A protein has these predicted regions:
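N-terminal beta-alpha supersecondary unit
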Residues: 1-64, 177
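DPxDG-like acidic metal-binding loop motif
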Residues: 59-89
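Acyltransferase
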Residues: 173-224
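Surface "functional belts" at beta-alpha junctions
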Residues: 22, 89-178, 206, 211-212
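Residues at secondary-structure transition points
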Residues: 30-41, 69, 73, 77, ...
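Phosphate-handling active-site elements
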Residues: 50-55, 84-93, 195
Length: 224
């Protein structure tokens, strides 16, 4: 199967293409260009380099976050429109899990969610990712307690270098940016297990801080 992967959950636009287990290409663009422009431009450029066209795609996978609210809406909308126009299946996957799939072993993706909070997940990655800590938004200080449960863990994500110095048992991934091929790979794994998603049910994963976590943060600020 040829799978197109799209992620716009961060300031990086990531587009990747795989055919079964083979990565055909990865394109990344980080900067001020609007996701809506960069996604379409990058997809057009990709298919100029291959002997097959966009109409030969079998599945579209898209990162559903958590991450940038605006970015997620753009990426998911583009994926839905393309799937409808091409009459192919579409599937949404965790951007955090996909980001961690560039490394093996215990890997955590950490994204700055502001005000002392992070979006985070933990996986054990080999041929397929095993999720040990589901996507969540929580105070970074609280997440550090979660990470301490493991001997050594790799920290991935664009914001990893902001937090690595505060985690004693961690090392920084060399693969900081999202890869669209990881989105495509995770999409294919989920598709084989669960089949396609109903496009109407494909929505961003807007994680919101819970009341308990908000109180934890408030107590921390009060004690400073």
């Amino acid at each position: 199967m040829k799978v197109l992967g799209i992620d716009t959950s961060t300031k990086t636009t990531a587009i990747g293409l795989i055919e079964d287990d083979e990565v055909l290409c990865d394109y990344n663009l980080t900067g001020r260009v609007a996701h809506s422009e960069s996604v379409t431009d990058m997809i057009h450029e990709i298919f100029e380099k291959f002997e097959f066209g966009l109409e030969d795609i079998d599945l579209i996978a898209v990162g559903i976050g958590p991450g940038s609210f605006t970015g997620l809406r753009i990426g998911i909308t583009i994926a839905k429109v393309m799937a409808f126009a091409l009459d192919v299946d579409v599937i949404g996957v965790s951007s955090l899990v996909a980001n961690a799939m560039s490394d093996y072993g215990l890997v955590s993706t950490i994204v700055d969610a502001r005000r002392g909070n992070v979006y985070a997940s933990i996986i054990k990655n080999s041929d397929e990712p095993e999720v040990l800590f589901e996507d969540e938004i929580l105070p970074f200080e609280q997440f550090k307690d979660e990470v301490k449960k493991y001997d050594v863990i790799t920290i991935a994500g664009l914001d990893g270098d902001k937090f690595i110095g505060e985690i004693d048992n961690a090392k920084l991934s060399k693969n900081k940016s999202m890869r669209g091929s990881n989105i495509a790979r995770l999409g294919l794994i989920d598709y084989k297990k669960n089949g396609p998603m109903n496009a109407f049910n494909l929505v961003p994963n807007y994680l919101k801080i819970s009341q308990a976590e908000a109180q934890y943060e408030k107590n921390n600020e009060t004690s400073k």
